[in-house]
Amino acid sequence: MTSKNPIQKALYLAFERAQWSVLRDAVPMTLSEQDLENLRGINEKVSLTEVTDIYLPLSRLLNLIVKAKQQRGLVLDEFLGQKPSSSPYIISIAGSVAVGKSTTARILQALLRHWPEHPKVDLVTTDGFLYPLADLKRKGLLQRKGFPESYDMKMLVEFIAAVKSGQAHVNAPIYSHVTYDRIRGQHQTVSQPDILILEGLNVLQTGLDSPVDIRRPFVSDFVDFSIYVDAEEHLLKQWYQERFLQFRKGAFSDEKSYFHHYASLTDDEANVIAAKIWDTINGPNLQLNIQPTRERAHLILQKGQDHLMSHVLLRK
């Protein structure tokens, strides 16, 4: 178990892929190849072997942690003489654009649902809490989309606080990657899940990162277990460019797409534009706001070439 980063070495237990995979401990595979196909994102190459080696041990770990939290809650309820509470266990998944957070979140949701202790697992992405496109334009934040200031943090924190407090039904806005905007009049309802997975760029931020008020609550204040999906920046940029080319052939070809004007680009033209977007928006956001929060995570999944997990770091 080694880590090149001295901070990570001090804070984490480091597992190579083979070491981590044995911790599955006979947990059965509950996904088929078709299930996995439905969970994959654009330009993702996750295989059933990846699920077996990486995600099944992780689902076992999370199941043990959630059960321990549930037992502690029952003890506290008995001590206080009150009815069992309905506060969900909240897992956050952070990381860069194009690292595969969404696919990781969907796979974990599918696996965790199969444990009898917590069959109801909801997944919410923070994309829906981006300010509406018109507001971003008005505030001059369109070129800062994805940066912390482009999110309605008040709405996001109020949402997660309501879910954590056990409120019966809590609505979250829905985001469209086609229109590049919130979908008006539509929402996702979260109704007292056993586990809520919250996926987004900046979910590991704390009040210390806020230029406004270090005292106000942040998403991380409500999270029970946090995961950071990590990769070297040159790989992230490469994956972003590859994904951009895939979108150009797919989603961008939709006339309703905000990026429809990119659909007719040649490969070379598309690569130039994708590289510019990375260098001016996604790269700086990673360096300034996302990567500095990495060592706050309880668990880091490190990816290498071809999106394959190479190491897992678990907080001591």
From Swiss-Prot:
Which EC class does it fall in? transferase
Q: Name one GO molecular function term.
A: pantothenate kinase activity
Q: Record's SUPFAM superfamilies?
A: P-loop containing nucleoside triphosphate hydrolases
Residues holding ATP? 95-102
Catalysed reaction(s) here are:
(R)-pantothenate + ATP = (R)-4'-phosphopantothenate + ADP + H(+)
Give the E.C. number(s): 2.7.1.33
The metabolic or biological pathway listed in the UniProt record of this protein is: Cofactor biosynthesis; coenzyme A biosynthesis; CoA from (R)-pantothenate: step 1/5
User: Which cysteine pairs are covalently linked by disulfides here?
Assistant: none
Cell compartments where the protein resides? Cytoplasm
The GO biological-process annotations, alphabetized, read as: coenzyme A biosynthetic process
Keywords assigned by UniProt, alphabetized: ATP-binding, Coenzyme A biosynthesis, Cytoplasm, Kinase, Nucleotide-binding, Transferase
Give me the Gene Ontology terms describing cellular component: cytoplasm
**Family statement drawn from the similarity comment of this UniProt entry:** Belongs to the prokaryotic pantothenate kinase family.
The protein depicted here goes by the name Pantothenate kinase
Q: Which organism is it from?
A: Shewanella sp. (strain MR-4)
Supply the gene name.
Answer: coaA
